[in-house]
Amino acid sequence: MTRFLLIIILGFLLTACQQVTVDEPEFVPHQLTELRVGTLYGPQIYMTSGQGNSGFDYDMALRFAEYLNVPLKMVPYTNRSELYDALKKNDIDIIAAGMTETPARREQFRLGPPLYRVNQVLVYREGVAAPKDISKLKGRITIIADSAFVETLTQLQKHHPSLVWDQVTDKDSEELLAMIANKEIDYTIADSSSVQINRRYLPDLRSGPVLEEKLDVVWLLPPTHSDALMSQLLAFWHQEKLAGTLDHLNEKYFGHVKRFDYIDTRAFLRAIETVLPRYRQLFETHAGDLDWRKLAATSYQESHWNPHARSPTGVRGMMMLTEPTAKEIGITNRLDAEESIRGGAAYLRDMINRLPESIPESQRMWFALASYNIGYAHVEDARKLAESMELNPNAWRDLKKVLPLLQKRKYYQKTRYGYARGSEAVHYVDSIRRYYDTLVWVDNQSKQPMPEDEQNDLIAEELPSMPAGSLSPDQPK
């Protein structure tokens, strides 16, 4: 009996020592028949409008989908927690939402290569004393839960124990900035690029101390089973970096918003409400295949929408046309608003058509406006100068670097048409781009977005104060 029990016990022990195997379901990777991109709404991230989709992350995602030869599916979420969960559950393939690299994100996800850099800044309202010490603020900081700003403040709190803040889950960055402008909250933290873009519509925003500098904005990939997608992303990034796409998009979304004039911005917003309604129909009618808002932005830069504007140099009217230019395009009364707008549109269209075909469609308007300002001949001089300096003569970002050189004897003496105030042309174009951005934002407030299937067929064009009276000067063209 004892021997029998011993045999049974030994049997149990042998069974217990054997390795127990559990059949786990094998991971089946998502077959990439489309690129599912999780994102957040924001002007520099992803926006939908009557003109299609736009945003740095959107433009890059669309190019990545084309690189992979699959359709793009943008999947907006309302907060970061939902985004993170969706990526972990394999509901999306990648997060492209203007997120910076942080220790917490490095621990949870795989991070793609850098797209651009931002600073984290404290944001307050015009009229409030500029804060110098974040631990001695007269008011409270409100930030978004699960954002990189939580990590930043947590680190600062170690050195400033009295530092406290509120976290919200039902707002986004744009809402918090609007709440600052509307005096609903005291302070928030935002990326510098977001502040620069939003103060075109909320001019009372002010940037305070920089809390974190030169943070890389990256895309997030799943922590596991993403080797193939990461390899493809790295190859794509390398290709686009060499092609100048990152520089192009940086110029497109951020190049023209770094300059800011508080008084001018407020005046422009007032003019949109009080003056533009009288002339909007004229801009829409005579713009033709141009975006009427670009035509209106150009007119504001020229005359502040004053049909009786005059300059000592002899230019007049809404579009500040010279007399020779007016005759050339059949305008008899430059002080008549409709005639001036019609003439300005025709002249701008002519400038666009004269440009070489090598200049991409998305850049042609900015080249044309520079031609509008200092003359086509000087723009051609600048393009040739750019080429001699091994810069791209068909990229506005490079022409911006070269145009100011036309004011230096070392350079203009080598050109065909000589001296030109190229730096003013750069400022002129950038100002129009800022006005255009603001008009688009205001116009879109009352419009419904296009259907999603139509939006992805469009790649948004580039968005983008010199003294009035610079339009179509009398010089070689």
Swiss-Prot record:
What name appears for this protein in its UniProt entry?
A: Membrane-bound lytic murein transglycosylase F
Query: What membrane topology does this protein have?
Result: Peripheral membrane protein
Species this protein is from: Shewanella sp. (strain W3-18-1)
Where does the protein end up?
Answer: Cell outer membrane
> SUPFAM superfamilies recorded for this chain?
Lysozyme-like (SSF53955), Periplasmic binding protein-like II (SSF53850)
Q: Which gene encodes it?
A: mltF
Return the EC number: 4.2.2.n1
Q: Where is the composition biased (Acidic residues)?
A: 451-460
Which terms does the record give in the GO molecular function aspect? Answer: peptidoglycan lytic transglycosylase activity
Supply the domain comment: The N-terminal domain does not have lytic activity and probably modulates enzymatic activity. The C-terminal domain is the catalytic active domain.
Sequence similarity: In the N-terminal section; belongs to the bacterial solute-binding protein 3 family. In the C-terminal section; belongs to the transglycosylase Slt family.
Catalytic reactions on record: Exolytic cleavage of the (1->4)-beta-glycosidic linkage between N-acetylmuramic acid (MurNAc) and N-acetylglucosamine (GlcNAc) residues in peptidoglycan, from either the reducing or the non-reducing ends of the peptidoglycan chains, with concomitant formation of a 1,6-anhydrobond in the MurNAc residue
Ranges where the record places region Non-LT domain: 23-257
Record: active site: 302
- One Gene Ontology cellular component annotation? cell outer membrane
What keywords sit in the KW lines? Cell outer membrane, Cell wall biogenesis/degradation, Lyase, Membrane, Signal
Query: According to the UniProt record, where is the region Disordered?
Result: 446-477
Where is the segment annotated LT domain? 258-477
Q: Where is the signal peptide?
A: 1-22
Q: Give disulfide pairs as residue numbers.
A: none
Alphabetical list of InterPro entries matching this protein: Lysozyme-like_dom_sf, MltF, Solute-binding_3/MltF_N, Transglycosylase_SLT_dom_1
